[in-house]
């Protein structure tokens, strides 16, 4: 890596690892995109630090398996150690798995659908200060509206903005961050 300090939000071990290896790096793997979408949804009202600490509990979120879940499977998942104990969010994961598979079938892959919003090229905001980072933008509002029309839940524009960053469609590394140019 070049000189400079990493983005200041990355403070804990989990945050630093996520920042250095995933955040704002283009992802075109459907399974990873689904996992990230669910992590972002589960994060609503919680800290990203907590989600990253409990990420291992989400690692088996396979959309094809989740799409077939009923109430018994949801209850069993909620009883598992490390999982965020929120029925609404757990049920949402099942709903989103079904919607995710429908989009993947329509577009050939979920990645193809997602990346069409940016014509396959990450948006680089070239941020100079942390306070310049928006919580949402026009792109996240458009993607959010379309996902909702397709039956997804917990996909408001703020969650979608974070998702687009995490999936690498938006590069919001500060220009002074050594990871700014990675993946562009």
Give the role of each language-model region.
Residues 1-184:
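HhH-family (HhH-GPD) DNA N-glycosylase catalytic core used in base-excision repair
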């Amino acid at each position: 890596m070049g000189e400079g300090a990493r983005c200041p939000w990355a403070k804990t071990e989990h945050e630093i690892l996520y920042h250095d290896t995933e955040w704002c790096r283009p992802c075109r793997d459907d399974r990873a995109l689904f996992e990230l979408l669910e992590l972002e949804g589960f994060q609503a009202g919680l800290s990203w630090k907590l989600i990253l600490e409990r990420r291992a509990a989400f690692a088996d979120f396979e959309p094809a398996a989740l799409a077939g879940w009923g109430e018994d499977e949801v209850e069993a998942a909620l009883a598992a150690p490390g999982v965020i104990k929120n029925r609404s969010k757990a049920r949402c994961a099942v709903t989103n798995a079904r919607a995710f598979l429908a989009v993947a079938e329509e577009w050939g892959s979920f990645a193809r659908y997602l990346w069409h919003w940016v014509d396959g090229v990450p948006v680089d905001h070239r941020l100079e200060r942390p306070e310049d980072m928006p919580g949402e933008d026009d792109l996240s509002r458009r993607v959010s509206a379309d996902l909702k029309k397709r039956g997804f839940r917990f996909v408001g524009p703020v969650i979608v903005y974070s998702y687009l960053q995490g999936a690498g469609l938006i590069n919001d590394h500060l220009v002074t961050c050594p990871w700014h140019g990675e993946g562009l």
